[in-house]
Amino acid sequence: MNRVVVGLQWGDEGKGKVVTYLSRYHDIVARFSGGANAGHTVNYGDFKVIHHLLPSADFTKNRGIAIGSGVLLDPQVLTEELRELKEKFPDYSGEIFISESAHVVLPVHKEMDRIIDEVLKIGTTKRGIGPACADRVMRVNVRVAELGNEEKLRYFLEKNLSLKKIYGVDFDAEKMMGDLSTFYETIKDFVVSPVQLKRILEEKSVLFEGTQGVLLDLDVGTYPYVTSMNCSSSGVSAGMGFPVEVDEVLGVFKAYTTRVGEGPFPTELTGEEGEKLRKAGHEYGSTTGRPRRCGWLDLPLLRYAIEISGVDSLVMTKADVLNGFEKIKVCVRYSDGRDLVSLRDLEKKEPVYEVFDGWKSLEDKNFERFVDFIERETGRPVRYISTGEKLEDIVEV
């Protein structure tokens, strides 16, 4: 059985913990998009692990991991995560696969990201994702496949860096050659072609791990305040590099809403209310450390994300954060009364709220009513509920 896990908001929904928990039911966890701009935190009890590139498998159970063609690899980050994997999980014996078609984020991409965001004010993570994607489309970027071939690596680096000089950005190609060659030595035993990866995964039960959230998807998110890649389930096959059969799509959402960076946010709470929610949920980015914008759950946006990503079942996270709130609001529609089929004018939307009595614990009837309401409004069952920070704090409904 193959399943996909996607975020249904603007990322940070808790997908990492959910994927790690669900990986016990699968042979392998595969990343199909994103880069080091993603941050997945998993609390194993005695220690926490934050992954930006490695798939969020349960390494205590030796689940395999695969990185597809659509993932952008930051050499420094991946090297550190592989080192940490050996250090924190010394008995790990799972298989590791990296597609040779995956592209590499270069130091020049991070500098370009910084320069571009000063002008566009998108609020990126400055991890070089956008510029790397642009170079990929322009066919001047370095892939994993080029790292083991000095002649090809030099060719692509020189082409790439010559274009950057237009922007006044200059990097040492020879130093970059050396760094990338060292990186290749670290990963070369894991590198496979897309055909090889396809054959391997066809024999496995695979959990495909999405990054960010549907509302940050390049094509169907809150453009231009989006990431540079596909975050919905439609990106799985393209991101892996071959057609993928999927049996179930699981959509993860918080019991409230958060967002990092710029862009429309109809239910955003400012002032004391927003700060209270931020502190209760420890809402600070795992990649940037920036405080997240916080607001109430937005059902029109949730329904939009569910439909556009073909979600079958739901996973609710951080419901425990709302423990002790006297009243809890949920946006049930917008004041214009229209069905949300486009995010084009989202910044003009005014939320209409339904107010729920709060709960002191997730055993309260009030919480049960809250979950029932969401299931009715979305037409999807809530299959799992995250009840705390630790990996095992998940209830199968």
Curated annotation (Swiss-Prot):
Predominant cellular place of this UniProt entry's protein: cytoplasm
Superkingdom field: Bacteria
Binding site for GTP: 11-17, 39-41, 292, 318-320, 386-388
Subcellular location(s) of the protein: Cytoplasm
Keyword DNA repair: no
GO cellular component: cytoplasm
Keyword Metal-binding set for record: yes
Pathway involvement of the protein, from the record: Purine metabolism; AMP biosynthesis via de novo pathway; AMP from IMP: step 1/2
The reaction(s) this protein catalyses: IMP + L-aspartate + GTP = N(6)-(1,2-dicarboxyethyl)-AMP + GDP + phosphate + 2 H(+)
EC numbers: 6.3.4.4
Positions contributing to substrate binding: 286-292
SUPFAM superfamilies xref list: P-loop containing nucleoside triphosphate hydrolases
Record-level Gene Ontology MF annotations: adenylosuccinate synthase activity; GTP binding; magnesium ion binding
Cofactor binding summary note: Binds 1 Mg(2+) ion per subunit.
Function, as annotated: Plays an important role in the de novo pathway of purine nucleotide biosynthesis. Catalyzes the first committed step in the biosynthesis of AMP from IMP.
Subunit structure: Homodimer.
Entry's family note: Belongs to the adenylosuccinate synthetase family.
Protein name, entry field: Adenylosuccinate synthetase
Gene that this sequence comes from: purA
